[in-house]
Amino acid sequence: NSRDRRPYIRPVARVELSEKDVKKRTVLAIVFLAIAVIAIGYGLFSLINTQPGWVEVTGSSREPNVSSDVKLMYDFSRSGGSATAENKQLSLIYTQACRDAHVVFSPDEPTGGIAALTAAPGEAVKVDPALWEAFRLLEEHGDRTVYLAPVYTEYARVFRSEGDGEAMVYDPAHSEEAAQLVRELASYCADPEHIRVEVLEDDSLRLVLSEEYRAYAAEYGLETLLDFGWMRGAFVVDLIADRLLENGFTKGYLISFDGFARYLGPGEEPFTVNVYHKRGNDLYRPAQVAFEGPMAWVRLRTYPAEVRDREHSYVYADGTAVSAHIDPADGMNRTGAEDLLVLGERC
């Protein structure tokens, strides 16, 4: 009808749904939902619960700590149903140990013993027993590496360089100006009359500075006078290992990104470690070492083998490497080999 202004509506077909099909669909929907719930539940269970076997234990502190520098692998094979509870306890101890290791050995930690020593030269400062023991060992062996902090600061400029041209500006091996600077710094760092830490009784230390070095440090803005440098990882790993052993955790190992490792005790099977060596610009594996533990494993290298090695080394396009292994006598990067492997009881 031409006068009918109602919009045209297409006819709707009526389809009878089978009651039988609706029931099938409902059953299938319930089955799929149940499968999804089970899968999600299993996933959550796997995340929350620790399965027997080797597991990487992680720290959970939001405060500055060394957990990014160290990896802890632990064997829960014999833990059975108690693996989750054991992992939780281990994680708490490991988290606190990683935080303590940062506070004790980081020169940048304002609440740590190194900062306290630097802030109060000439005064006896009570420190963590681990820091006291570290300085006692250095004194016993006549090692003055810890006093090279200002020299490390200069080499850090080389390691952060974006190219060979920039690196050569800061590298004492290529720049006479840079070489003169590190020699001048090393002349203070190497001389116990200018700087030394005295090991006192009752876990106390005293930083002794000459007036000349104090004036020099103030004039040139030297903020960090003490830094364990490349050997920091050794003391960090030993501190954490000692904490774990004190609490009865012996079925694992710790390893730092820069080559320090502690195997806490004998495992279910002997530990096997690959030994790598640099040949030209390539790394190859000449051997494997198998042992039952406990044991400390130290592998030093002058070249980057891991991503984070760029923090303490630089390699020129011609393959020449610069590392943080500094001669205290003159501040120059000097090593007798490209890599070194040492085994012992402690790092």
What are these regions (language model features)?
Residues N1-C347:
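Mature catalytic core of soluble alpha/beta enzymes
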